[in-house]
Amino acid sequence: MTNSEQERWSRVKGRLRSTVGEDVYTSWFARMDLEAVQDESVHLSVPTRFLKSWIQAHYAERVLSCWQAEMPEVHRIDLSVRTAMRCATPAKEAPVAVEARRAERGDAKPADTRAPVMTPVAASHDALGGSPLDPRLTFASFVVGRANTLAHAAARQVADGRRGDPVMFNPLYIHAGVGLGKTHLLQAVTWAGNAGGERKVLYLTAEKFMYGFVAALKSQTALAFKEALRGIDVLVIDDLQFLQGKSTQAEFCHTLNALIDAGRQVVIAADRPPSDLESLDDRVRSRLAGGLVVEMATLGEDLRLGILKSRVAAARAHHASFDVPEPVLDYLARSITHNGRDLEGAINRLLAHSKLNNQPVTLDMAEREVRDLVRPQEPKRIKIEDIQRVVARQYNVSRSDLLSSRRTANVVRPRQVAMYLAKTLTLRSLPEIGRRFGGRDHTTVLHAVRKIEALVGKDTTLNDEVEALKRQLQD
């Protein structure tokens, strides 16, 4: 790509950001790249089939108009998926896997391509009863906001699919902190997916998966367990961070591979991204990262207010006289910032106090009842990728330079500063930091940390730079 094309692309992105707004741009366009400009066509790419489909369906004309404002001669936008476009030709696959992927591309009729990996047996095994589902956790009760737009759209896409449809992204991996809505989305997928009766959607916690596998081994029914699991249309796994044990992880990996290769959908949730699941085998992490990985961010005040109103409406369905005044809702939304469960707990407390004491809800009552839920603002969670990006921009190098093996002075110092910040601003271990910096050994990270620690004590310029970087990352 030429410099002039890159400059044009930057202006188009700025125009697109202004047109759709910051939230929409971040959700759908932040990972879109320019590949080439040829004659009257512009070739763009995105990392997943889901993003490609969504942009084509909802924003194609807008992207084209932004390009035409920059280059009037452009009349066509070609959007492709980077992973499919840039990967080397794979080795010859087993027939089932090949046919399943043809179905994803639309090269063959889906009905002819969704052959199961094994002949499914009756789903009578204890583990296939699934984990309990909460009837309240549906799409209808899920409140959508800036923090969860992409995760909700992806989950809805899975739930609305039909048997025989090509799988757009696999697996769908959703990660977030406690109480931000992961389980709600996964159970909503399960409820909606099973509603039509056409597909079998199974929801399991990682703990239930482990229990089922161990029980099957003890009862010598492991083969039935495996066959039944691999006959599922959509497998939904919650709290993957709790998956332990080499044999259990190996079986999970085999199940994951078998379902994906057969064109079956897998949806997974955990409290961290795949790369941070250090207890999992590298093969599992790699497979998880190959799908659509979506983070659900912390709840903004508007979203917290929406959740509170939703919970009040749900409570009013059973207690018609229950009401929470707007000033009380505003106070709760401002004050309870930790997670959605605390918000629901606050409404439950107000309901109980109001009903048991036959008193209306007031601001004074709310302040008394939820005092323990009002917590100090948590510090911003800083990611190693954010550190690399900010440091690279500060020292005018690229992120790939920081991850490379280059040893030139203009790269070594920024890399050491980034490693130092990763150690001081995150909870990541030295081996994990080294792995995020191009697979370096933990001793290299330790050397960098000690080097910068020594220098900031005597080099005021470097100390000022490091402190400025910390402020940027923490703001």
UniProtKB/Swiss-Prot annotation:
Residues 355-475 are annotated as: Domain IV, binds dsDNA. Residues 132-354 are annotated as: Domain III, AAA+ region. One of its GO terms (biological process) is regulation of DNA replication. It comes from the Bacteria. ATP binds at G179, G181, K182, T183. The keyword Coiled coil does not apply. GO terms for cellular component: cytoplasm; plasma membrane. SMART domains: AAA (SM00382), Bac_DnaA_C (SM00760). It is found in: Cytoplasm. PROSITE patterns: DNAA. InterPro entries: AAA+_ATPase (IPR003593), Chromosome_initiator_DnaA (IPR001957), Chromosome_initiator_DnaA-like (IPR020591), Chromosome_initiator_DnaA_CS (IPR018312), DnaA_C (IPR013159), DnaA_dom (IPR013317), DnaA_N_dom (IPR024633), DnaA_N_sf (IPR038454). Residues 1-73 are annotated as: Domain I, interacts with DnaA modulators. Its main location: cytoplasm. Residues 73-131 are annotated as: Domain II. Signal peptide: none annotated. Pfam families: Bac_DnaA (PF00308), Bac_DnaA_C (PF08299), DnaA_N (PF11638). Belongs to the DnaA family. Oligomerizes as a right-handed, spiral filament on DNA at oriC. Plays an essential role in the initiation and regulation of chromosomal replication. ATP-DnaA binds to the origin of replication (oriC) to initiate formation of the DNA replication initiation complex once per cell cycle. Binds the DnaA box (a 9 base pair repeat at the origin) and separates the double-stranded (ds)DNA. Forms a right-handed helical filament on oriC DNA; dsDNA binds to the exterior of the filament while single-stranded (ss)DNA is stabiized in the filament's interior. This is Chromosomal replication initiator protein DnaA. It comes from Bradyrhizobium sp. (strain BTAi1 / ATCC BAA-1182).
